[in-house]
Amino acid sequence: MNKNKLDNIYKLINNKKINQAQIELSKLGPEFLKNSEYLYLRSKIFYINKLYYIALDTLLIALEFEENEKVYNLISKIYNTLGNKELSKKVANSDLRSTAIISLKSELTGISQK
């Protein structure tokens, strides 16, 4: 059931129905706050709305719960958009991403670490 809700929101985002996706995300309860897929979808909407830094914070929080390739890809894409090509490449590279993410989390004090 929960997966179906998230899949529906993913489809809305891909069909560029961003406002509808935001409404559907807001209907989800607090049990989703630690769900990495929910956080990824939130970040995707933030990215589309050009809220890059909140998207990054949300993605870094998502990594606290589950490491996921698409989360890393979106982080890389955002840093590329922001003009930080070097960090974008590090996050995209599976051999370098761990060090880059740890460094980011230590610099961004609002992100808790396990």
Locate each region found by the language model:
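Start-of-helix register in tetratricopeptide repeats
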Residues: K3, E37, K70-V71, L104
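Terminal, low-structured helical/coil segments at or just beyond the last alpha-helical repeat
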Residues: K89-K114
